[in-house]
A protein has these predicted regions:
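Donor-sugar nucleotide-binding helix/loop cap in glycosyltransferases
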Residues: 1-275
Length: 275
């Protein structure tokens, strides 16, 4: 491990406030450099209602944040830090509630897309699985970009667009077809995106987050994303209680909403997430 002096030297050499040759990184409300990088790394934790912070003020963990933190036990012995997972179910339940509530357009992050991604995903999978034209295997990984780029919470229209995509290209549309639908058709071509981001990076990150809830699982060797039917009670509860949501303009009110524990949802038994 680094000594205190070595650690200080590393930070200073990479701090644009000290080393003027470094351009630095700037986030709104935070000074350029390490403070802004802190916000970049932890902003999602604020958006999900786990921890609230502002520059120059104390960092506050919410109830759900403390619940998530209790997933692990951390020991420090002679400068060595060890971590042990002691309550794995806490992580699943905390992220399940957070993603069930998370609005893409919120006071912390303003986006053109206005929906709750987890709910949109669950609803469109249910519609696809109920369609007699298909085999009930969920949504294709290649179709996930449409969920990510979809501008509203209209799962029926998204389902119909996926049906058309399957009619025209089966389950194997080209990357360029997906790019055209997402960028030109859905977003109207107002912004350019890297092709690899659309068909690989964004879907990988999205699916990884959704799997943290324990509500979805892979099928067909990872080619399809389906509902985890071991969690049908939770899924039905979430769709019944969170599909319709209130919009917030205040960061504090939105954070309070996100961090408030839903006792009924937390009371439902967690099923271990398959690896």
């Amino acid at each position: 491990p680094l000594t205190d002096e070595e650690t200080k030297d590393v930070y200073q050499q990479n701090d644009p406030q000290v080393n003027k040759s470094i351009k630095g990184h700037k986030e709104a409300g935070f000074p350029k450099g390490w403070p802004s990088r802190f916000d970049t790394q932890f902003k999602l934790m604020k958006v999900l209602g786990f921890v609230y912070y502002e520059w120059g003020k104390p960092i506050n963990f919410s109830q759900t944040g403390n619940y998530l933190a209790d997933t692990v036990s951390i020991e420090i012995d002679s400068g060595a830090i060890s971590r042990e997972i002691v309550n794995p179910q806490n992580e699943q339940i905390a992220f399940m509630q957070a993603f069930a509530k998370q609005q893409r357009c919120n006071p912390f992050i303003c986006e053109l897309n206005d929906n709750i991604p987890l709910i949109l995903l669950l609803e469109v999978i249910k519609k696809l699985n109920s369609d007699p034209d298909y085999n009930g295997s969920g949504i294709s990984y290649k179709e996930i970009p449409l969920v990510i780029f979809w501008k509203d919470n209209d799962a029926e229209s998204l389902y119909q667009r996926i049906k058309l995509l399957r009619k025209e290209h089966r389950y194997n549309p080209s990357n360029e077809v997906i790019e055209d639908i997402c960028v030109n058709e859905i977003l109207g071509g107002f912004k350019k995106f890297d092709l690899d981001s659309i068909v690989s990076e964004y879907p990988d990150e999205f699916v990884r987050k959704m799997r943290m809830t324990g509500l979805i699982s892979f099928r067909g060797g990872g080619r399809f994303i389906d509902i985890n039917h071991n969690e049908d009670d939770k899924i039905n509860y979430i769709l019944a209680n969170y599909a319709t949501y209130r919009k917030y303009t205040s960061k504090e009110e939105y954070f309070d909403y996100m961090s408030d524990i839903d006792g009924a949802l937390f009371a439902l038994k967690a099923v271990e997430i398959p690896k």
